[in-house]
Amino acid sequence: MINIALPKGRLVNKVYTLFEKIGYENKELLEDNRKLVFENKDKNVRYLIVKPSDVGIYVEKGVADIGIVGKDILLENNHDVYELLDLKFGKCRVCMASVNGYKEDIERRLRVATKYVNISKNYFNSINRDVEIIKLNGSIELAPILNLSDVIVDIVETGSTLRENNLTVIKEIIDYISARLIVNKVSYKFKNDLIKTIIKNIEEVL
């Protein structure tokens, strides 16, 4: 049995379709239900539907053999897994943004609101900028509007959410983020042939 962790939310159908194309289908997964575990014994596959930020943990701890996760989450959490394939969808960037017309005072500590604490720290350390990191878990765009922060660090796809809230990108911190296929290190050793076959088949349909 191969256990595959899929990210709950907007990408789950796209990711599942990828596995369906290579013969690991489970039609029940696309039905309107609240189940989080889907098993197809004929195909020897079990899908686990988990929060995107938790996919890496499930794979690192061996609960899942394979997972699909955004590169941003891998950079933020530094999970001890093998990153084996860029799936080339779910593309976005990690950017610093603020309200339109914002002018930075370089003499003052910069207040940064973000859910990407480690990515932000690494970036600002690299440019020797003194910052206060304010960790938020959602509605990051509100922070500079309400003066909770000077800037935000967040993922940007089209930029429409920023524009709708009168925010603009100041700096592109990471220019390419996409969905990645990750593998548990022990699984890669003991299920190597199966995992390599899955990767080869995925590469052929990308």
Curated annotation (Swiss-Prot):
- EC numbers, comma separated: 2.4.2.17
| SUPFAM superfamilies reported in the protein's UniProt record | Periplasmic binding protein-like II
Which GO biological-process labels does this protein carry? L-histidine biosynthetic process
Q: In which pathway does it act?
A: Amino-acid biosynthesis; L-histidine biosynthesis; L-histidine from 5-phospho-alpha-D-ribose 1-diphosphate: step 1/9
Q: Does the keyword field hold Transferase?
A: yes
Q: What CDD domains would the database entry show?
A: PBP2_HisGs
Note whether Membrane occurs among the keywords. no
Pfam families membership: HisG
Under catalytic activity, the entry for this protein gives:
1-(5-phospho-beta-D-ribosyl)-ATP + diphosphate = 5-phospho-alpha-D-ribose 1-diphosphate + ATP
Signal peptide span: none
The organism's superkingdom is given as Bacteria
| Gene Ontology annotations for the cellular component aspect, listed alphabetically | cytoplasm
What is the role of the protein in this entry? Catalyzes the condensation of ATP and 5-phosphoribose 1-diphosphate to form N'-(5'-phosphoribosyl)-ATP (PR-ATP). Has a crucial role in the pathway because the rate of histidine biosynthesis seems to be controlled primarily by regulation of HisG enzymatic activity.
Q: How does it assemble?
A: Heteromultimer composed of HisG and HisZ subunits.
Q: What is known of its domains?
A: Lacks the C-terminal regulatory region which is replaced by HisZ.
Protein name according to UniProt:
ATP phosphoribosyltransferase
Q: Which organism is this entry from? A: Brachyspira hyodysenteriae (strain ATCC 49526 / WA1)
